[in-house]
Amino acid sequence: MASHEEILADKAIFAYLHRMIGDEGIELIRRFPTDKEYSDEELAEVTKINLNSVRNTLYTLYEHRLAKYRRIKNNETGWLTYLWELELDNMYDSVSKDLEIILEKLRKRYKYESENAFYNCPNCGNTITFSDAMDSQFVCQECENKMVHFDNDLLVNALQKRIARIEENLGHV
């Protein structure tokens, strides 16, 4: 099991986590004690990070299976306490899951871009499909300029390359 600092030293993992939880979340991971489970209040005190930021970070990490909690009930008050610990060993599963979601979106976009012809307004930049351009008689509905054909081959090729790269990283090839 890698330490929190070793995991954060990986630039790709750091960028992934930073996008997910921001600066304070990264600091929480850096300062998160590994000796036992901690309540969110204890973590805020130990790490000197705002309690709301600690909670938001923990919930986000939990959603990605990068943190887990154990719930205990105080029999006298009936209050529940959540004891948290990090599960950063699940990092690569989390990244893979998110990449699968991105891959599906890119595939849909690729299909849309490759199956349609587009027209663009040189004045305002509005872009529409051939079908919509025909319906509007190739006149921009925003500024009433004439629409011109827009060659999206560059975008289609870029999407194709990105999809291939992600598929290769995920072992789909």
From Swiss-Prot:
Q: Name one GO molecular function term.
A: DNA binding
Which terms does the UniProt entry file under GO BP? Answer: regulation of DNA-templated transcription; transcription initiation at RNA polymerase II promoter
Q: Does the keyword DNA-binding apply?
A: yes
Q: Which SUPFAM superfamilies match?
A: Winged helix' DNA-binding domain
Q: Gene3D superfamilies under this entry?
A: RNA polymerase ii, chain L, Winged helix-like DNA-binding domain superfamily/Winged helix DNA-binding domain
List UniProt keywords, sorted A-Z.
Answer: DNA-binding, Transcription, Transcription regulation
Domain HTH TFE/IIEalpha-type, chain residue ranges per copy? 9-92
Has the keyword Ubl conjugation been applied to this entry?
A: no
Which Pfam families does this UniProt record tie to the protein? Answer: TFIIE_alpha
Q: What SMART domains does the record tag this protein with?
A: TFIIE
Q: Which domain of life is it from?
A: Archaea
Q: Which family does it belong to?
A: Belongs to the TFE family.
Function according to Swiss-Prot or TrEMBL: Transcription factor that plays a role in the activation of archaeal genes transcribed by RNA polymerase. Facilitates transcription initiation by enhancing TATA-box recognition by TATA-box-binding protein (Tbp), and transcription factor B (Tfb) and RNA polymerase recruitment. Not absolutely required for transcription in vitro, but particularly important in cases where Tbp or Tfb function is not optimal. It dynamically alters the nucleic acid-binding properties of RNA polymerases by stabilizing the initiation complex and destabilizing elongation complexes.
| UniProt domain comment | The winged helix domain is involved in binding to DNA in the preinitiation complex.
Subunit and partners? Monomer. Interaction with RNA polymerase subunits RpoF and RpoE is necessary for Tfe stimulatory transcription activity. Able to interact with Tbp and RNA polymerase in the absence of DNA promoter. Interacts both with the preinitiation and elongation complexes.
Q: What is this protein called?
A: Transcription factor E
| Biological classification of the source | Archaea, Methanobacteriati, Methanobacteriota, Stenosarchaea group, Methanomicrobia
